[in-house]
Structure formats: C-alpha cells, structure tokens
UniProtKB/Swiss-Prot annotation:
GO terms for biological process: ribosome disassembly. The lineage of its organism: Bacteria, Pseudomonadati, Pseudomonadota, Gammaproteobacteria, Pseudomonadales. GTP binds at residues 17-24, 89-93, 143-146. This is Elongation factor G. GO terms for molecular function: GTP binding; GTPase activity; guanosine tetraphosphate binding; translation elongation factor activity. NCBIfam families: EF-G, PRK12740.1-5, small_GTP.
Amino acid sequence: MARTTPIGRYRNIGIVAHVDAGKTTTTERVLFYTGKSHKMGEVHDGAATTDWMVQEQERGITITSAAITAFWQGSEKQHKDQFRFNVIDTPGHVDFTIEVERSLRVLDGAVVVFCGTSGVEPQSETVWRQANKYGVPRIVYVNKMDRAGANFLRVIAQIKQRLGHTPVPIQLAIGAEDNFQGQIDLMSMEAVYWNDADKGMVPVRKPIPAELQELADEWRSNMVEAAAEASEELMNKYVDGEELTNDEIKAALRQRTIAGEIVLAVCGSSFKNKGVPLVLDAVIDYLPAPTDIPAIKGSDPDNEEKLMERHADDNEPFSALAFKIATDPFVGTLTFVRVYSGVLASGDGVINSVKGKKERVGRMVQMHANAREEIKEVRAGDIAALIGMKDVTTGETLCNADKPIILVRMDFPEPVISVAVEPKTKDDQEKMGIALGKLAQEDPSFRVKTDEETGQTIISGMGELHLDILVDRMRREFNVEANIGKPQVSYRERITKNCEIEGKFVRQSGGRGQFGHCWIRFAPADEGQEGLQFVNEVVGGVVPKEYIPAIQKGIEEQMKNGVVAGYPLIGLKATVFDGSYHDVDSNEMAFKVAASMATKQLAQKGGGELLEPIMAVEVVTPEDYMGDVMGDLNRRRGMILGMEDTVSGKVIRAEVPLGEMFGYATDVRSMSQGRASYSMEFKKYNTAPSHIVETVTKKQG
C-alpha cells in the first residue's frame, strides 16, 4: 500500500500545559475544526472526547494521553493538500508528570497552553523544563483571553522572566476579558474576528483598528527582527532597510523555532471559539515534520557502546517506541507506538529489543478522539495503537528482528510514596494481583511489591492523587475492592564515610566448594550519581574478569536492604581493588555473596544516614489567609523560599518534607475556606532529622 500523506505533511504534536489552562478544551476544538468530532465536548459537563476514563470526566482533569489523528488544510483552505496531525493530549497534574514526559519523548513539536489570567504557573515550569530536556520545538498559545484579568503581553513578559525564553508574538489580542474580540495577525497586518454562527470556524479579516495600529507596528518590527537573525543574508537585508517578504519571514521563523532558538506566541479563547484555527495554521507553518528533526538515536542490543540511528524514512528498517500501554475493555491491551522508521503491516513479526522477545502484531488501530479506525499498516512518522502485544512495557523498542536497535530509553523517576493495599475478600485476592500487574505495565512510575515480612502488597507512586486514582481504577475497571493503609514515605539511605571492607565467602567441605574473596573501597558517590557508581581497579588478574559483574550484582542487591533502617541505599561509589580466587571452587555465586557480605558491613563502618524526600510546594492563596498558610508550612518543617503576587493571589514557594504533607489537600482547604490551591512535586532527598530517624528505626524494628 502506498503512503497516503507524504511525511513532509505530518505534524506530530502535543498540547501541553498545567491544570486548568484549558488544554483539553483546546484539544476538543482542534477535533471539532478538523472535522473529526461534530459535537463539541465540554469539560464542564464531563463530555470531552479525549477524556475517556470515567475518573477523568468526574475530576475534570486529563490522566491518560489519548493520541488522535486528524487532518487540516488551513483555516482558509490555503494549502493545496491536507496535513495529517497526530495530536497527543497530555495531563497537566504534577502527579502525572511521567505521562507528560513520555508524550514529549515521541513528539516532534508542542503547543504549550497558558492561561491569559494566571500566566506562568508552577506546573508550566515543570512542563517547560521537560520540553527543554527533550529539545521539543514549541509554540505558546495564551488561552482564556476572555477571562477577567487576562492580559496577553503580561503573560509574554512572565514567560521571559520565569522560563528564560523570549517569546516572539505573531499575533496581538484585540481587547481582553469580556471585550476580547479576536487577534491582530502580525504577518498579514490584519485584524481577525470570529463568528458565533459557524462556531469560529472561518476567520473574518478586516483592517486593524486605528487605536491598535501603533502597537501592531511595534510588534511587527519585533517579529521581523527575530526573523532577520536567522541568517546573515537576511540580517544584511534588514540592516540595509530592505523589506523582508512574508514568505522569507515565515521560513526564517520556522527555521529558528525548529532549532529551538525562539518560541512563537499566539492568543485566543478556546472556550469562546476565538482563535484555535489560527493555532492549527501556526502548527503547519512553524512546527517540524518528522523529516525536519535529527534522526533518532539508539544503540545496538548486543553492544550498548555501539551507537546507531534511524531516519524518518519508509525504506529504513522498522523501528518504533512504545510510549503508552492502555487496557481497553473490548480489545484488551493497546500498545501506543510512535513509528520512527520503516513500515509495519498487521500480521508482521517484530522483536522487543529491550527484552529480546518476539512479538506478532495482531491488529492496528488509529484513534480519532474516541472512535477507532482499523488500519492495515503503519509507516515512518505514524502514531497508532497495536493490539496483540504480549509483553511490552512503556518505553521499550519494537523493531525489525534482522536489524535490531534499542532506541534511547526514557528515564522514569523513583516513586516517593507507598501504601499497603489489602483485598477485602478472598475472591479479590487473585483479581487484585492481575489488576496491579496491568496497571504497573501501563505506568512505569507505579510499582508493586510484596513485603516479605508482613506479606502485605505495597504499591508506590508519585503522590497521593496518583495512588488514589490507581486504586479507584482497580475498583472500576477490574472490580477489585481493597482496603488502603496509611501512606508511607519512601526514605532512602546513604553512607557518609569512606572505608575499605573485605568480603570473603568460603565453604570447603569435600567435593566442589565455594570461594569468593574481594576487597572493596566504599565512598559517597560523585555529585549527580544517584545509584551505584561501580569502579573496577583490580590489576594482575587477582580476581578474574568474569567475576567482576557478579561482585557488582552482589553490591546492588545488598543496597536494596540499606544500612540504617532497611531503605534502599543511594549515591554509593564502590571500587573493587583486590581479592583472590580458587581455581576450582570459585564461581560467580561465591563472589556475589562475598560482595554482598562486604556491603552489609557498611552498617557498622559506613556512617549511614537516613534521607527523606523533600517536595517543592507552591500554594496559591488569597492574601487574607497567607499568614495561616505560611505558619502551617513552617510547622510542617517547611522552608519558605519566596513569595510573589499574581492575579490569582499570593504564591508561596516552599520546600517541605513529604512525610509532613499527608492530608495537606484537606488542611489547606479548611484553612482558606476552600480558596487556596497547591501543587507539589519531588525535588530532592535531604538528611532526615534525628527524631525522624528514631521513629523510622523503631518502626522498622
């Protein structure tokens, strides 16, 4: 089958933002204007087409990023052919940053939505940081221009100040709040208005109102200057006072946006149907096609040192990244993939190069909001869901078995909070095991383990809301009723002293014995190293090369058990520098045990300390309650970092230990009569004070 849309007309984009910037409403409008959903869904009435899990509709927030395929030819049909958009809607709640992170990983560009009133909020910073990490070109869309206190240019200034990027507006707002009427298009230098009759489908262009002409001229020259900086040739033309054509300006702005040098900004009101078609036009004009960005990097499964790459081309070997696993009541497991290269037809065999397992693709579907279309093949640049994958987890690579590659992996954060779950009845016991397994496969930031001493099932995640929603899904989707214990903090441990320790494991009693012997130098790891930093300094073959990995494994396994109170050890540098072996009795197992015994001795010799997770907390509160909120944060051992005034109230930034924040949602509401809101995300681990160490050690017995 031939390709229906050339890859140059693909746009794989995400719509990202923080809670309540109006992101899902914007996605809804995108679907409406691109003709895929003829009834607009509103988040207010719980009918939005991308929010398809029941909890999302109830809570009015988006949890799973649905991938939707849509087509667009331009707001005034200015393009000869249609462009194919694959749009990924992402959650903005900080407990789901992992969802945002993995969506950004497979996107080529993003539309970052800000609220015209509240501007840059705590979560916008998180999302912006993630987009920087993956080098995603983006456009800023300032939404909710019809809201009281909305001000486009103020938000632009805030982005510059708080996010360190200077946005280049390609539009200005005409009016604001109740009087918001439309935009000034700085490219064509016209005013653009919208009709309620066609729900803001087709822009109506008129001359710029006289009172805004001067402002428009000023920002037009700002835009032209940004374009001129794209090349020496344009700069010379600009300096010589020659006019740049709109085509030259567009091409230059596109080039600089894709290179990540500038961020273009547009405005509108999705809810009032004023402006989304122009956002779609900007996506076509300024965001990259899969062929405009560098080839994806990867490594050879047999030799991680050997780097490889795949270009966005149908003729290259097939490679794709699984970026989301969803359980569907009708077809079972859906594996959402982004195809980077090659072609895959249904029925083909592929290999999961991370696990080295073969998989056969059953059916393939593309999602259009909440309808599905079955397709026969996927090609480079496509995003689709595969049905029939047996053992694929988020972040793994599917590729051609003859030409395997492991695409750059995603990093998933370690969970910071745990609770015990117990099934209510015997029947629930087995169902709960299956349900938790499926949920963990979908969400790598959610972990399940069994406590060996108590036999309890412990689930861990990124925050209270994260675990609440997972337990809720277990009840709804898998009919499992469970009792939930009190949240527990996931502490960590580290050593503070340098020491040299001998690990020796000898068992020789007739026949084949065991002999492992090593000397290890332990120290706190170098800055920025979170896990084990393992160094081999053995010379002269006193410990044969083949036993070195076993020593590393022995240390890693023992690190899980800690040295103070049984919590995992982090930031450890271990240098194996000496030892001995026995020709007959030495084997990998013996060296693993020897290394494990050496690591155990850190409890006496390593000066271990307990670390507690510290959260970055931002509370937005009306001024009347500020004293109470700050006093309360201080009582929770919080460190206030600063405050600022915003339209929505005072913003207090603080760092607070997670252990003191349980139940904060209820407390902050009652303190402020329901008017304050807060967000928090994991920041770092800090040394825990002595009273916490005492309580924790006592509890661990």
